[in-house]
Amino acid sequence: MVKPERIKKTAASKDTEGKVIYWMSRDQRFRDNWGFIFADELRKEHKTEMAVVFSLADNFLEATERQYKFMLEGLEELYNELYKKNIPFYLLPGDPVEKLKKFIREFDIKHLVYDFDPLRIKQKWQSGLTNSLKINIYEVDSHNIVPARKASDKKEFGAYTLRPRINRQLEYFLDEFPEIHKRSKTEEFQLQKIDFNRAMASLNIDRDVKPVSWIKPGEKQAKKTLHYFIEKKLENYNIKRNDPNSDALSNLSPYLHFGQISAQRIALEILKLPHKNENIDSFLEELIVRKELSDNYCLYNKNYDNLENIPDWAEKTIENHRKDEREFIYSLEEFEKAETHENLWNAAQNEMVKSGKMHGYMRMYWAKKILEWSESPEEAMKIAIYLNDKYELDGRDPNGYVGCAWAIAGVHDRAWTERPVFGKIRYMNYNGAKRKFDVKKYINHWNS
């Protein structure tokens, strides 16, 4: 049974006898998915039928062919798995609100379940339904182990304030998922034949950013990637995770972003290991506390992608150093083409453009240099988000917005020694990177 704290009822109707749909969005899987499970519970409770629907929006937050291809190939695998279990799946291209309203009227839906999502655009879509439909509507948080609304009811200052709140509730929410069984074929919903190649071709999107081949999408591959990380990489994670030349990271972030794997499943598998150590502690800190801190920031601060509502000390130091002379100033086009004076930064940009996944340490360095070499912090934030969302497989995500805000505006950080341009925002430089890893090796790899 889904814990009631995961569920928020956002619209109610006395008319409860009717069909159920699970509007899949952020959590693109049916295994280990509390939203799907809750919709299935409603199906059983009301002795009715249920289908999964997915809204295929054009040009979602400037996503490109790279991200859409990864997502749609994952959805095709999901669709095939659901088909085998006689669970109907509908792909609805076009405006999400209008297409869902039409679907709900056509099939006389009485219960709608959707994924929790803190981003403005998703909440706008959800409000468009809750404000206009007289049916029962529920939000379920299956993306976070401790549901974001339960973890905290306000914007937290940093990991140090959210961590104890999560730790107090973690054991309660870290339960095992039930198995999903095959069902009888439905009468009301038809098992659809979906041409995913045609769906991909129909999209009005940027086709210049091409898919990457080093990572394969889908729930099955996500689980293989997890088990490879546990068996081959986890034992050195804490020592090597800040070395971009070491293949020490999990590579799970694209799967987490698209919901092709559950953070809760990852944690459950990691915690099965016989001996807890600093590698496990470090990884779970990133997976749980830092990831959920990003959702917290975006949930309780609708200006998550700009410099409104940043910490007071950061706002003051940015104003104090706004007019400081910059030694270098680059345009968006120069940043995008990796045409700066610094080979290390150019290598990081090339890594992102070529692979769709910049190393975590370099993401911090990359964003801080954009602050240093832009006309203003506001311009730096726009450039960093634009490039991150355009090229990263895991772009358009709370983690990305908060990562840029941390680097550029001191969000979830503290004041550091004051210096030109940065003020009291944490500083990173080339010499610091040299002390951490073989900079020349990294540069040669990505600038060749």
Task: List the model feature ranges, each with a label.
Residues 1-177, 350, 369-374, 379, ...:
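Trp/Phe/Arg-rich N-terminal binding region typifying the photolyase-homology
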Residues 4-6, 42-47, 67-71, 190-196, ...:
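Short, functional N-terminal and low-complexity linear motifs
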Residues 16, 148, 154-310, 437-448:
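Glycine/tryptophan-enriched, flexible segments
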Residues 26, 243-440, 446-447:
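Active-site-proximal binding-pocket segments
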Residues 31, 70, 74, 218-221, ...:
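Soluble or luminal CAZymes and related metallo-dependent hydrolases
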Residues 35, 74, 78, 222-229, ...:
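Alpha-helical packing segments of well-folded alpha/beta enzyme cores
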Residues 65, 69, 213-216, 220, ...:
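Charge-dense, low-complexity intrinsically disordered segments
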